[in-house]
Curated annotation (Swiss-Prot):
This is Large ribosomal subunit protein bL19. It holds the Pfam family Ribosomal_L19. This protein is located at the 30S-50S ribosomal subunit interface and may play a role in the structure and function of the aminoacyl-tRNA binding site. Belongs to the bacterial ribosomal protein bL19 family. It comes from Buchnera aphidicola subsp. Acyrthosiphon pisum (strain Tuc7). The keyword 4Fe-4S does not apply.
Length: 115
């Protein structure tokens, strides 16, 4: 039974996902269906959390839009995600950056990792 589940999960896992960590600025291109139309929508922000659970893996991206914080949780292996682009690598010491929710402006900046 367990090997059957592993086999099905292995078929559904995406192979073209870039390596990114918490603190990185990424752009996620997602398919959006509005009525009968289908288009790509881009969501760019800082990764504040990653959950690695094989096929159930997810990551949370936060951005500031019109002075309001917007967070979105994406399933890593979802068919709705077209591509993930790493724009900038951030230098952080924590895995979960939930403290960014209370910070605004210059206090919410993250240093860049150069390597």
């Amino acid at each position: 039974m367990f090997s059957i589940i592993q086999k099905i999960e292995k078929e559904q896992i995406k192979k073209n996902i870039p390596i990114f960590r918490s603190g990185d600025t990424i752009e996620v291109k997602v398919w959006v269906i509005e009525g009968s139309k289908k288009r790509l929508q881009s969501f760019e922000g800082i990764v504040i959390a990653i959950k690695n659970r094989c096929l159930n893996s997810s990551f949370t991206v936060r951005k500031i839009s019109n002075g309001e914080g917007v967070e979105r949780v994406f399933q890593t292996h979802s068919h709705g995600i077209e591509e993930i682009l790493v724009k900038r690598k951030g230098l952080v010491r924590k895995a979960k950056l939930y403290y960014l929710r209370t910070r605004t402006g210059k206090a919410a900046r993250i240093k860049e990792r150069l390597n």
